[in-house]
From Swiss-Prot:
SUPFAM superfamilies: F1F0 ATP synthase subunit B, membrane domain
Origin species: Latilactobacillus sakei subsp. sakei (strain 23K) (Lactobacillus sakei subsp. sakei)
Keyword line: ATP synthesis, Cell membrane, CF(0), Hydrogen ion transport, Ion transport, Membrane, Transmembrane, Transmembrane helix, Transport
Entry protein name: ATP synthase subunit b
Family: Belongs to the ATPase B chain family.
Length: 173
């Protein structure tokens, strides 16, 4: 009885195992047909997306590096332009300063020449005034001394000869 139980159990075990095996194979086939395709498609899409994201990130990194290099070049260029602008401004300022100095020197020379002319004119005016005053004074003194009036022509010739004598004395000094 006990042996029948073991033989019966083994047959039932074999039948159950066979049934489970068939159901498992059917389940694997169904899962493979209905689930494995979409899952593997999803995994492939995910793999493609990750690859595209990595490629995109690499491209973005390259673009950023190019942009950084371009910005660095532009910065160097703008620095050199700024230096050039400053140098040009310095040169223009120096030229303007030199022009102003030259103009000021010319104005000083003109003022000196005008001052010399004014001084010479004042000296001549003073000499003429002194001649007239000396002549008038001489005439008054002479007329008082002589008690006689001289003619205008005689007065002028007397004065001119006296002044010429004074000029000659000033020149010899």
């Amino acid at each position: 009885m006990f042996s029948n139980l073991i033989v019966g159990a083994s047959a039932s075990y074999l039948g159950d195992s066979l049934f489970v095996l068939v159901v498992f194979i059917i389940l694997v086939a169904l899962v493979g047909k209905f689930a494995f395709g979409p899952v593997s498609k999803m995994m492939q899409e995910r793999s493609n997306k990750i690859t595209n994201d990595l490629d995109s990130a690499a491209q973005s990194r390259e673009d950023a590096a190019k942009l950084a290099a371009q910005r660095a070049t532009e910065l160097k260029s703008s620095k050199s332009e700024a230096v050039e602008i400053v140098n040009t401004a310095k040169q223009n300022g120096e030229k303007q300063r030199e022009g102003m100095v030259t103009l000021a020197q010319e104005e000083v020379q003109t003022l000196k020449q005008n001052a010399k002319k004014d001084i010479e004119q004042s000296r001549l005016d003073a000499l003429n005034s002194a001649r007239d005053d000396v002549a008038q004074l001489s005439i008054e003194i002479a007329s008082k001394l002589i008690k006689k009036e001289l003619s205008v022509t005689d007065q002028k010739s007397l004065i001119n000869s006296y002044i010429e004598g004074l000029d000659k004395q000033n020149e010899t000094r």
